[in-house]
From Swiss-Prot:
PROSITE patterns assigned: C2_NT
Residue numbers bearing the Phosphoserine modification: 228, 276, 288, 320-321, 350
Designated gene of the protein: EEIG2
Ranges of residues in domain C2 NT-type: 1-142
Family of this protein: Belongs to the EEIG family.
Species this chain originates from: Homo sapiens
Identification of the protein by name: EEIG family member 2
Amino acid sequence: MMKKKKFKFKVDFELEELSSVPFVNGVLFCKMRLLDGGSFTAESSREVVQANCVRWRKKFSFMCKMSASAATGILDPCIYRVSVRKELKGGKAYAKLGFADLNLAEFAGSGNTTRRCLLEGYDTKNTRQDNSILKVLISMQLMSGDPCFKTPPSTSMSIPIAGESESLQEDRKGGETLKVHLGIADLSAKSASVPDELGACGHSRTSSYASQQSKVSGYSTCHSRSSSFSELCHRRNTSVGSTSTGVESILEPCDEIEQKIAEPNLDTADKEDTASEKLSRCPVKQDSVESQLKRVDDTRVDADDIVEKILQSQDFSLDSSAEEEGLRLFVGPGGSTTFGSHHLPNRVGSGAYEQVVIKR
């Protein structure tokens, strides 16, 4: 049995954020644990969910031991687990939302590296795992050991090209294509160019086997990046017409532009037919919506009709007798006044109070 090489690294781990959290509110925290090469454990601060995102921005530094085969020089896996948890009962208990396992051997000697990873579930049989994305920054520095070593193939889901955005972005959607706007002819040529767009993808979600092998064969990350970038630039897609294209058959953006410009223009009659068909579909759709609204209105009671019936049933004419039955002002001896009806003098006595009459 061959003796393995021993290495010691200083790891600077920064816990950035957790996005796409399926909670409107709540308090989340993380527990970090080094499963191989040490006994480091730590907990992050407890932060509140804001706009479906939790930001920690907390840095941790620790020492990590690694080993490598003396024959190949490839570092053995060193797993670092980040467990995301949610507070329950005011912090007295917690629930495990998911975890992310990071192989620190992939980041050895690569400088500052940003990694986004989907959370894995603890109980995938009974619960559905949410698509939360954990963002971390890892930097490793060799403290002791042979500086000549090889990193294992990366599990990142994109080819690390310098100047490109990081992998596993939130706004990234599957099957993104580079669209070239060439006028109205693109509207009628969409049905004919579906296989072309399926074969032409502007971004590779998974790294190819050759790019992974280039990482293994080189000691520096710069060499692997340059080799994978040159491989991507010189790759050509020979079977564009087939719809069963995988990640390996990727067409360059420049090839796609040249291919679309070189396509013959369709006849003007075809353009007019497609335009007239699209215009003729709109009134039909609008009529169907109006008929549906009419059916809904027929089942409802019209409030205006009810108000009109109530107003018609009321009698708003003036009653002449109501004018004569109001209060009257009476003046008594000594200038005393009182209010009452026209029967007041009869109760008080004749001549005691006289009614005040105002002539109009």
